[in-house]
Amino acid sequence: IGMSKEDYYHLSYEITMHFAKAIGPKRDFVFIYVSGAGTSETSRQFWSQTKSKTERDLRELPFKAAYGFRPAGMKPYKGQKRLQGWGKYHWLFTWIPGFSNTIEEVAKAMISCAKCGYFRRTVDVRDIDTLSKWCK
């Protein structure tokens, strides 16, 4: 990803945890952290281990709830002019269920978690789809 492990750890873990502690964890706050698909403590990839540790440690803080969102592919939004990376292959997303969401679905799912809660603390692509239609 173009940075040292130390820099990545500082950016992804330390800054997030400092922010979470600085806002003063409160029992009525919901913290939503976007980690991404493939996040795992047992992964060989440093980014994945770091994101997983961040999710775990956020859950230990005294928030009402802390969710780790793990989106994967992002479908382009209507009218999007420039597609980079996997966005160029957005037509594949319709054929691979559980692989992608729209940015609108992710936003609605986050609002649903904050307003109504969710039984899973790790929210994957399919959960995002469900949550985006769930709590109004």
Residues of each region from the PLM?
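SDR active-site strand-loop-helix element
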Residues: 31-37, 69-71
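A short, flexible beta-alpha/helix-coil linker loop
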Residues: 1-2, 37-41
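NAD(P)H-binding glycine-rich loop region in Rossmannoid oxidoreductase-like domains
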Residues: 1-18, 22
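Internal, well-ordered alpha-helical scaffold/interface segments
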Residues: 17-21, 29-32, 52, 56
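Residue-level signal for alpha-helix termini/capping positions
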Residues: 24-25, 115
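A short helix->loop->beta-strand "cap" motif at the edges of active sites that frequently abuts
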Residues: 26-29, 63-64
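Oxidoreductase cofactor-interface core, primarily capturing Rossmann-like NAD(P)-dependent enzymes
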Residues: 41-136
